């Protein structure tokens, strides 16, 4: 089946059938983003209700193209809901897109891919496109295609840690990292999964704090967090990623005060998750020290960038910017049989506003 006049390509395999070619392409090039590897898709499948529906294409020039894709378990292809990747499994600026043999995908190849997805979207196909492919996708995506935009923050590590420390970190970061050491904060890092339970306890504390900050009912916030981010998810990533996943905990006086999870592949290090006990961490500089240690390790390993991920709040944006980050666009494209994504987003926003208003009425003294 011809999918594009400008660049012709055909589907060769889907799911397990695409795996040998996919593993071959990923093994050839360590610079390929982690989100485009079979190992990351296996993490998603092991820890959530998705199955591998990755597509392998062959272009008329002989090049192979891979679209990492997952299908909600229990749905046939023609009625399926496809994600690339599912919500909660993005990796910041390393957000996915297409893996192309011989270098980055060209606009004509992406056009061919878009044409195919438009013809066969299932009920919905959602594709998140980050740093590697964002510009090419934006140049050819049809105006009628629904798209949302996010922003990731990335720190350039070129020049080594001494350059990053002296020229990119702000004086505030340097001061707080030193203060943490003076106040007895010690960072412990592990890539065996041993610290996952410690991190998870900090994460549950953070969920309670986020509920208060966002004006959400505590029980609802806890339920959503347990559903989307259970401890088993962190454990699965740590186990499957092995040395590519480092859990770091900042300790003070024998108590954990903050933690981060960092993933690595090739030139990239990605800050994937973070959590803290805000009362214990307050005024200690623990978070700055955690990231300083992770960034120093990434520099020592020869990484080129440290991805702080997509910011969720203005407070987090300001914190990450103090490390000297630059902003990277991340686009999310929705291919739908029935155009409902935009309406769902509006309803979701309206529902959050109603909940917040109800909480203000219930607690008038606050």
Task: For the regions a language model picked out, list residue spans one by one.
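Active-site/acyl-donor-binding loops of N-acyltransferases
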Residues: 2-8, 71-73, 139-163, 300-366
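A short, internal acetyl-CoA/4′-phosphopantetheine-binding micro-motif in the GNAT/acyltransferase core
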Residues: 93-105, 274-284
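Acyl/amide activation-and-transfer machinery of modular secondary-metabolite enzymes
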Residues: 88-98, 147-154
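A conserved beta-strand-loop-helix scaffold within acyl/acetyltransferase catalytic domains
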Residues: 5-61, 67-81, 132-149, 160-282
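Non-catalytic accessory segments adjacent to catalytic cores
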Residues: 104-152
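Aromatic (often tryptophan-rich) hydrophobic motifs at membrane interfaces
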Residues: 56, 79, 84, 88, ...
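Short catalytic-loop micro-motif centered on adjacent basic/acidic residues
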Residues: 125-127, 188-189, 304-308
């Amino acid at each position: 089946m011809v999918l594009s006049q400008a660049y012709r390509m055909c589907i060769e395999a889907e799911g397990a059938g695409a795996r040998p070619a996919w593993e071959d392409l990923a093994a050839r090039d360590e610079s390929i983003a982690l989100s485009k590897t079979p190992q990351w898709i296996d993490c998603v499948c092991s820890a959530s209700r998705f199955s591998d529906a990755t597509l392998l294409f062959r272009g008329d020039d002989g090049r192979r193209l891979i679209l990492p894709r997952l299908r909600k378990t229990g749905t046939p292809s023609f009625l399926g809901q496809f994600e690339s990747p599912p919500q909660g499994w993005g990796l910041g600026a390393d957000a996915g897109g297409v893996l192309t043999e011989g270098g980055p995908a060209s606009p004509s190849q992406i056009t061919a891919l878009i044409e195919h997805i438009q013809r066969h979207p299932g009920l919905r196909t959602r594709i998140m496109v980050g740093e590697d492919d964002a510009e090419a996708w934006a140049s050819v995506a049809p105006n009628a295609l629904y798209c949302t935009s996010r922003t990731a923050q990335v720190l350039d590590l070129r020049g080594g840690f001494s350059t990053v420390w002296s020229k990119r970190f702000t004086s505030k970061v340097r001061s707080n990292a030193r203060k943490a050491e003076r106040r007895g904060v010690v960072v412990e890092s592990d890539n065996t999964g041993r610290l996952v339970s410690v991190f998870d306890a900090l994460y549950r504390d953070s969920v309670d704090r986020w509920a208060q900050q966002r004006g959400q009912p505590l029980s609802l916030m806890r339920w959503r967090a347990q559903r989307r981010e259970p401890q088993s998810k962190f454990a699965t990533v740590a186990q499957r990623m092995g040395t590519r996943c480092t859990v770091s905990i900042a300790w003070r006086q024998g108590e954990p005060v903050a933690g981060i999870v960092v993933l690595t592949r090739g030139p990239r290090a990605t800050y994937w998750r973070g959590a803290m006990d805000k009362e214990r961490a307050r005024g200690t500089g623990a978070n700055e020290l955690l990231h300083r240690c992770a960034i120093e390790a990434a520099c020592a390993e020869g990484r080129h960038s440290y991805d702080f991920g997509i910011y969720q709040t203005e407070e987090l944006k300001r914190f990450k910017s103090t490390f000297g980050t630059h902003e990277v666009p991340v686009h999310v494209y929705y291919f739908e049989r029935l155009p409902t994504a935009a309406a769902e987003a509006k309803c979701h926003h309206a529902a959050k506003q109603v909940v917040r208003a109800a909480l203000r009425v219930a607690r008038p003294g606050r």
